[in-house]
Structure formats: C-alpha cells, structure tokens
Amino acid sequence: MMQKSLTIALIVVSICALGVISASAQPQLLDPDVFKVNYFSNNGVSGAPDATVRVTNPGTSNGNLCAMVYVFDNDQQMDECCGCITTPDGLRTFSVTKDLTSNPLVGIVVKTGDVKIVSAAVNNSPCEPSANVTPYPSLRAWGTHIQNKVGSAYPITETEFQAATLSAGELSSLQADCYFVERLGSGHGICSCGTGD
C-alpha cells in the first residue's frame, strides 16, 4: 500500500512539474490593445511625397499616455526610437521623413521599414522608450503609405495601424534595442515627436 501511494505521489509531482515547465514555456502576453504596427515605403525617394503617422489618445485612460515609437528598417534593425507624450483627445503627427527617419543610427536613411508603437503609461522625462515601459491601452494610430510610382505620380494610401499581441519578450527586446541605439548612437537614432498634441 505504501509503495502504491508513493508511486501515485511521484506521478502527481511529475505531472505538476510538466505543467509548470509547459506554462513557463508559453510567452507572457500583455494587453492586446497596447501594440500597434504599420509599414512605410518609398521614404526619401526623389519626387515622392512625405508619409505621415498620426497618433491620438482617445481619452479613455483619463490621462496622458506615451507613444513609445520604434522604427525599423526592412532588414529588421532598429534605426530610431523615441517616446512622445499624448494628451487626452490630442493628436500627434509625425513626418516619416523629418521625424522618424531623419536621424538614423547608422547614417543611412531608411527607404522602407516598419513602425511599432507601444501605448504606455507616462514613465520618465516624461516618456522614455528604453526602460521601465509599462504598457497601457488606448492609443490609436494611422499611417499614410507612398506607393510605387504610377506614371508621374506616387499614389498615397492610408491605413490604421494594426493591433498586434505584445509579448513580454517583444517588449523587453524593444526596450533593449532602443537602449543600445540611444547609447551607441551618440545622439543618432533618436526620432522626434512631430507636431500637435
């Protein structure tokens, strides 16, 4: 009887251990309304217009929020990052050319890439994208896209940023990459907050 109880106890402990290992292997997911992604194209191409990114705080949080902005080239390397305050019901407008890609880490202007925005609580000075980012839902964003030239014109389209699920690992990676960009760039790699709000 004692041996049967010991065997059952070992089986229960093994199953619990497997459950803990399995649970820890799952990525920790954060609120689904905190992470927005979109792309830009034909940036800085001669004759092409400038694209814009617009971010609004709908006011549902009853306070200021940070738009933590991370700009990547088409080779998946972070080129610029910045944190920008957004007040309730405020609208912030970024020029892709002047605000998001004019100060690249390596000195080469990115023609095509993507923009990731984390909606976050105000942290430091007032918005620091490289550390202590606490995702907080609500920001909305739209971006214009400069399409490939048709005849003599570059067609422009606009889309809402897509909501994506932000994992704790992705948030940690964004902050670490931005920290690296800020420290290595000696002033390069820091985007600017555009106009408005």
Language-model segments: residues:
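Bacterial N-terminal signal peptides that target proteins for export
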Residues: M1-L10
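C-terminal cell-surface anchoring/sorting signal
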Residues: M2-Q3, A17-L18, S22
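Bacterial N-terminal signal peptides
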Residues: A9-G19
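Gly/Pro-rich, tryptophan- and cysteine-flecked surface segments typical
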Residues: S22-D197
